[in-house]
Amino acid sequence: MLAKHGRIIVLEDDIEVAPFFLRYMNSALDFYENRGVFSISGYTPELVMPRDYQFSTYVMHRNCSWGWGTWAQEWDKVDWEVKSFDSFIRNARQRSAFNECGNDLTPFLLRWKKGAREMWDIVFCYAGFVHGRPTVYPRKSLVRNAGTDGTGSHAFADAKKYSSPLAANVSLSAFVPGVAPNQELLKQFHDFYSTSTLRLIYNTLMRWRYILFGK
């Protein structure tokens, strides 16, 4: 698909979409191609937009696989073996930068390294980080994951947190042109995805276990 068309739009079977989802995705793929963007997301958590924020999209250094698209040249940047992992996991500065959009990201990558190979999207996310290329998000969500209630492959204990209402409309002429995250939105985004203190302690112990014992 990517080799033939140069781009792809992906939906899992438990994703509900707004009627104009495909129009948005194709327009965004056209607009952001060759602009330093890694992927396009159809989902967004509910964020409070700054009063002076006039755009219909925003960017973050974290991808989302709930209805998304990318280009062949970005997909080809991914190192699916994550050969830099052992140096990354020992580098506090790199971990902090990767966790800019949620302190759950490094633990997800560690879980992948330890065998959870179905978590391919964290490898894609890490590649975007390595290459400094963000994901574009809509102002309001254009997809809803119906599988977070336990019926899908990946269930969530706090499913309601991720259930954003579908947008009633979307502007295709107000895409944010830059690729630097808005700092107010970044703070909200980080807080939305970050874990509890107890989970943070557990994740830290798991990281040190890997560093010291390789498991």
Region spans (language model):
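An acidic/histidine-cluster motif and surrounding catalytic segment
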Residues: 1-10, 15-215
